[in-house]
Amino acid sequence: MKKTLSIILAAVLTLSLVLSFASCGQGSSDDKKSSLTVAVPNDTTNEARALLLLQQQGLIKLKDGVGITATVLDIEENPHNIKFNEVEAAQLPNVLKDVDYAVINSNYAIAANLNPAKDALVIEGSSSAYSNIVAVKEGNENDPLVKALVAALSSKKVADFITEKYSGSVVSVVDNPGDGFDSSVDYASLSGKTVSVAASPAPHAEILAVAKDILAEKNIKLDIQEFSDYVVPNNVVEDGTVLANYFQHKPYLDDFNAENNTHIVSVAAIHVEPLGLYGGKQSSLDALKG
């Protein structure tokens, strides 16, 4: 009886080992897939935007109805076993070499010498709802300096600059570009005054440089203050340090106001920066779609 029991136990142990090795072999295949990492922005609106871009490519499926509030926790289907790294948006170009792919905002891509129109493996269409805006503290919407700034940024000169400079990496969304001036503004009364604007270095500060020349025609000085993050430009508008900012899209502003109890409003949409998926360790989408 003991001999029979020993034989049975030996058989069970052998079978268990075989199954364990088989399982390990299967796990290595899954691990190979799961080793593919995609870095995405860690702020609410840009993370959702990145995930929606990946969903459009059939790489993931999000829960119904999550929209612009989606996070990695809302991924319902992940057939390619993608591992997501949530990274501060400004740092995404810096981590690109350490991950397989990264979804990067165009302003940070451009600042890192990437060309979104050429280097992105996947890019949003120019009809993206995430237009970059000029924003001011509530109550300053009708300030003549704000109106003068908006008119300059909404000019044909600026729209043409965007088209020529960025070749589709940044796209003007101004429907009817004007001559750069607002007929309702008394420019003579603004002569010698300064309008201060917080902006990211690229492309916003570059675009503002064109508007600066337009305002200079009316002897208005444009003080462009550059920031490399997504928080300070709103804080300095809220506390009155600067009059306006130009660096963000409307969904981000709405989320920022809700989280920080700030009172900043959009006064004009100027351009859109299509979000792109860039290759880091991978040079194509083959590893994701294979």
Where are these regions (language model features)?
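Beta->alpha turn/N-cap motifs
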Residues: 88-89, 97-100, 104-110, 201-202, ...
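A bilobed periplasmic-binding-protein/Venus flytrap-type ligand-binding module shared by bacterial periplasmic
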Residues: 130-148, 274-287
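Bacterial lipoprotein signal-peptidase II cleavage site
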Residues: 19-33
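Ligand-binding "clamshell"
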Residues: 98, 111-123, 255-267
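Short helix-initiation/N-cap motifs at beta->coil->alpha
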Residues: 66-94, 224-235
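Periplasmic-binding protein-like
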Residues: 48-51, 55, 145, 151-174
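Short, well-ordered beta-strand elements
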Residues: 34-39, 190-202, 220-226
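Short, polar/charged alpha-helical segment
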Residues: 48, 52-60, 64-73, 201-226, ...
